[in-house]
């Protein structure tokens, strides 16, 4: 008999992989010679790297980076033998500072390390990360420069609140391999980039923010998006992120 086991995580209790193992042991104890296949699930927040490497071989790399509060941390990314690079943001991009003082700079550091290692196909799990700076810090770590109206450098690693001072964006020194890489972003939350359905506007109470404070952050994200479109002459349509469960082995398909 063939048995497929694909258990979701029990949030905060056991992982998808652990749940699968328990079910596998139970089935094996009751059905002799059962052909049992485990399929771990991940949801854009937890277990992405573990799930992928359960199905594929490859290497994991430790790199020095920063958390959302710009504290030194050790982060990790993985590269499979099939050429997929996995970055699980919530494993290192956490913070305790006020939301508008957190940065995604550390994500850029890990992404840079992966690009230095010839990464071509990069999957980034964004669920559970601690920053809401529209990726400004990440871009700075990758070489982007931001200037105010007096041509002074704006250091967005200090947090999202610095976005309001940006008047010009210079991407001339961004990592040269970024343009050649295929990026896939995963999230555990259905949201818009900004507006009433943005993640911060839907979850601000969990961060002990009031609606007005959340709206300030949301407006910064909107401003950064508009600045990009204006400065770089880009036409960007509405950006939405949807929640989905994926099987680990499917992410390795071309």
Q: Predicted regions: what is each one?
A:
Residues 9-16, 100, 119-139, 238-242:
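Glycine/serine-rich anion-binding loops at beta->alpha junctions
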Residues 26-95, 183-191:
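Glycine-rich nucleotide/cofactor/substrate-binding loop typically near the N-terminus or early
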Residues 24, 34, 157-160:
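Non-transmembrane, aqueous-exposed alpha-helical and coiled segments at domain scale
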Residues 105, 109-112, 119-125, 130-181:
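Glycine/threonine-rich beta-strand-loop-alpha-helix active-site module
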Residues 1-3:
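Extreme N-terminal starter segment of soluble prokaryotic enzymes
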Residues 72-131:
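Anion-binding (especially nucleotide phosphate/pyrophosphate-binding) glycine-rich loop
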Residues 99, 183-243:
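Carboxylate- and glycine-rich phosphate/diphosphate-binding segment that chelates Mg2+/Mn2+
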Residues 245-248, 252-254:
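Single conserved hydrophobic/aromatic residue that forms the stacking wall/gate
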């Amino acid at each position: 008999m063939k048995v497929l086991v694909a258990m979701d995580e029990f949030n905060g209790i056991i992982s998808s992989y652990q749940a699968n193992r328990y079910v596998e042991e139970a089935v094996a104890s009751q059905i002799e010679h059962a052909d049992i296949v485990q399929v771990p699930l991940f949801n854009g927040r937890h277990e992405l790297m573990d799930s992928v490497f359960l199905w594929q071989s490859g290497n994991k790399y430790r790199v020095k980076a920063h958390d959302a509060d710009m504290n030194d941390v050790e982060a990790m990314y993985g590269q499979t033998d099939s050429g997929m690079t996995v970055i699980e943001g919530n494993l290192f991009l956490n913070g305790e500072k006020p939301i508008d003082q957190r940065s995604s700079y550390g994500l850029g550091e890990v992404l840079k390390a992966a690009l230095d290692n010839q990464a071509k196909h990069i999957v980034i799990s964004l669920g559970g990360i601690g920053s809401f700076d529209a990726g400004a810090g990440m871009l700075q770590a990758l070489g982007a420069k931001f200037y105010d109206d007096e041509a002074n450098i704006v250091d967005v690693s200090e947090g999202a609140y610095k976005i309001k001072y940006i008047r010009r964006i210079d991407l001339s020194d961004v990592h040269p391999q970024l343009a050649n890489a295929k990026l896939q972003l995963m999230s555990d939350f259905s949201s818009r980039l900004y507006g009433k359905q943005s993640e911060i506007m839907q979850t601000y109470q969990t961060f002990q923010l009031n609606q007005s404070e959340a709206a300030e952050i949301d407006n910064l994200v909107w401003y950064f998006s508009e600045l990009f479109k204006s400065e770089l002459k880009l036409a960007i349509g509405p950006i939405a992120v949807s929640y989905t469960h994926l099987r680990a082995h499917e992410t390795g398909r071309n």
